[in-house]
Swiss-Prot record:
Stated name of the protein: Dolichol-phosphate mannosyltransferase
InterPro entries: DPM1-like (IPR039528), Glyco_trans_2-like (IPR001173), Nucleotide-diphossugar_trans (IPR029044)
Transmembrane parts of this sequence: 264-284
Gene: DPM1
Record's compositionally biased regions (Low complexity): 17-27
The keyword Transferase is annotated on this UniProt entry: yes
Length: 294
């Protein structure tokens, strides 16, 4: 069950945009999907920064972009914040899910309800810079059907200040996905896809999976030449708490097994060997090293 808070089309047409300056057309050409849980404090800065980013572009298509917040029944004032933003003329709506949970299924729900032919997924915590969204959308306006915001592009490094063991784990995680896709950052949650490519993958998507971008990269069947990459710097969380915990790596490995079977029908031995190495590093860094005071 879910509750959608959305102004009716006629009301949108009568509403004069406030500081947003967005088009209020009922048929947006682009959609930005934002899965959220207890992110109320970040919603206003997210929407207003997106508005400013679109306003700085000369593209009329970008001006006609909708934002869809898919909220897992946070009850933290998110609905009221979106309602206030709507009254100010921002093209934003919220879907409140009362019986479903999880980031991947929230993204899938948003993509299914999006009216734009070009769709972007981004986090609500402002670690994905709203100012980079126009570049991702423009990258889909051509021959590309998938665009990935990468933290490993030229001049960008997310993990340069990480400890050695964490950098090795990060590199190992990307290495494990290499046979599945040539994308430099398949674990990124900042990505875009065309409606057509999403529909190709929709019946095969694991909505309970972990990394939805990787799932879509594999199951939409996009060729490496159809993937664009836009480097971005991974920002600091502005409000709220990080939802990462020690289970994320194991969820990722479970997803990789499912994707290898989907793509190749089997799991190669090299995958098992790298998994054992990554697990050994994880156990050392999170269990043994703290016990030994290393």
């Amino acid at each position: 069950m879910s509750i959608a808070l959305d102004m009716d089309a006629s009301a949108k047409m009568r509403k004069q945009p406030g500081s947003s300056g967005w088009s209020t057309s009922s048929t947006p050409s682009c959609s930005v999907i934002v899965p959220a849980f207890r992110e109320n404090l970040n919603l206003r800065p997210l929407v207003t920064r997106l508005s400013s980013a679109f306003a700085s572009q000369s593209s009329s298509e970008l001006a006609n972009t909708e934002i869809i917040i898919v909220d897992d029944n946070s009850r933290d004032g998110s609905v009221e914040t979106v309602s206030a933003l709507q009254s100010e003329g921002y093209n934003v709506r919220i879907i409140v899910r009362t019986s479903e949970r999880g980031l991947s299924s929230a993204v899938v729900r948003g993509f299914r309800e999006a009216r734009g032919q070009r769709m972007i997924c981004m986090d609500a915590d402002l670690q994905h810079p709203p100012e980079a969204v126009p570049s991702l959308l423009l990258a889909l306006n051509g021959q590309k059907s998938f665009v990935l915001g990468t933290r490993y592009g030229v001049g960008v490094s997310m993990d340069k200040d990480w400890p050695l063991h964490r950098r090795i784990i990060s590199s190992g995680a990307r290495m494990l996905a290499r046979p599945l896709t040539s994308a430099s950052d398949p674990m990124s949650g900042f990505f875009g896809i065309t409606k057509h490519s999403f529909h190709t993958a929709d019946h095969h998507i694991n909505a309970q999976g972990f990394k939805i971008a990787l799932d879509l990269l594999v199951k939409s069947g996009v060729h490496s030449t159809d993937i664009a990459e836009v480097p971005f710097s991974f920002g600091l969380r502005q409000e709220g708490e990080s939802k990462l915990d020690g289970k994320v790596m194991f969820k990722y490995l479970q997803q990789l097994v499912e994707l290898y079977r989907f793509r190749f029908g089997t799991v190669p031995i090299v995958f098992v060997l790298i998994v054992l190495l990554v697990l050994a590093l994880y156990i050392w860094s999170h269990v043994l090293a703290p016990m030994l005071g290393a």
